[in-house]
Design a protein with these regions (language model features):
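Short strand-connecting beta-turns/loops that link adjacent beta-strands
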Residues: 25, 66, 92-94
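Short, acidic/polar N-cap/turn motifs at the starts of alpha helices
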Residues: 16-18, 58, 84
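Conserved hydrophobic/aromatic beta-strand scaffold that supports enzyme active sites
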Residues: 19, 28-30, 51, 68, ...
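Tight coil/turn sites that cap or link beta-strands
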Residues: 36-37, 73-74, 80-82
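Ligand-binding loop in jelly-roll beta-barrel domains
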Residues: 82-107
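Flexible, glycine-rich phosphate/dinucleotide-binding loops
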Residues: 37, 60, 107
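A short, N-terminal "cap"/entry segment at the start of jelly-roll beta-barrel domains
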Residues: 1-43
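A short beta-strand-loop-beta hairpin characteristic of the jelly-roll/cupin
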Residues: 45-46, 51-73, 88
């Protein structure tokens, strides 16, 4: 049976995105981050709303309005569609395990 916390022995050089469920209006994925960040000159500007929970590790997010958020295991947030944001830090030990839900969550 799949386990959200189970990690393979390989070391990830890139963030790993694993689709768990995908439907007509929703996508649920697990993301494994091992120190990766968003390019400082780039922003995510997603078409869909995103609800995300950090299940393990620590991370820092930044928004286009200069808001900064520090996340620890168990913290979650809702990022509305077209809200510019980026990941500025993800812990390596422990690795970050995220659960993200993408969809039209406000409509």
């Amino acid at each position: 049976m799949p386990n959200i916390y189970e990690l393979s022995q390989e070391v990830y050089q890139l963030e790993k995105f694993e689709q768990i469920v995908s439907g007509k209006n929703i996508q649920i994925e697990r993301i494994i981050s091992t120190g990766q960040t968003t390019n400082p000159r780039e922003w995510y500007d997603q078409e869909l709303d995103e609800w995300v929970i950090l299940l393990q590790g620590e991370a820092d997010l930044a928004y286009g309005d200069d808001t900064r958020i520090k996340l620890k295991a168990g913290d979650y947030l809702l990022i509305p569609a077209h809200t510019k944001h980026r990941v500025e830090y993800t812990s390596i030990e422990p690795v970050c395990i995220w659960l993200a839900v993408h969809g039209q969550l406000f409509h």
